[in-house]
Amino acid sequence: MKRRAWATRKVGGFVDQWTETHTGCGTPKAVGGLVQELLGQSAARQFDASTQQIEAWEESVRVVGEALSEVASRVAGARDWSVLFEYSIPRREIRPDVVILGSGFVVPIEMKVGATTYSRADWLQAEDYGKDLEDFHEETSGLVVVPVLCATAAPLSDVDLAVRPSTSRVQLVNADRLGSVLTEVHSQFGTNFPIDCDRWDQSRYRPTPGIVETALDVFGGQQVREISHAYADNLTATVDELRRVITQARERSERVVCFVTGVPGSGKTLAGLSAVHQ
């Protein structure tokens, strides 16, 4: 089966190569070899890598190399972790720049080389990586997901590893802080069982439970009025109209498609779940 990641490395081998070739100047072989592999994959996948993209890869590999060298010196078992570059999440058409497979946890990383701030758009992108892996990636089921936005030149930011429910909030780090955050993630969520990189890389697409099961989980005996205070004022009216249309379609043995529109956060999903549940 074709790999989804454009390049993968065991952390131990990657760190050894990094340590042997890194001199603090120029481009270490560990960087050059990975970038050449990424270039080969980009050509094979008909992706036109610009000069800017190549430079971003070079700097990303440098940052990750420094971070993992730090982690390997602090965390027993970290050499058995894996690092993947440009991983294509099944059917989601998005690629985290880097994914770290630790022992019991997954860290998708959005790399922003040279960025001096943590933009909301980048934050949302990192959050999407975490949600997509949790909701659609079979081999990530049961693992803790910690999405990271690494703006390499940005100021330090606080770390908050509270998990809700199995994916933490996005961690904001710069190049100097990435290694320490990975160490903290292991300290809080690490197990003694490293993730099988090949199996994870080739994971099947596994969507979230069907809408009926989700509705049952969400409502749990509650009525829409009891949990809709944060949504649109006309949510109840919307649900009532959906139910009216559904009832009419049943009575007439018709098939009907209903389209519910609204701004983000207005309660469209909740309206659909409520209509199905009731």
Roles of regions detected by a PLM:
Residues 1-212:
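Accessory nucleic-acid engagement/destabilization modules that flank
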Residues 218-227, 254-255:
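Short glycine/proline-rich turn/loop motifs
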Residues 269-277:
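Motif I (Walker A/P-loop) of helicase-class P-loop NTPases
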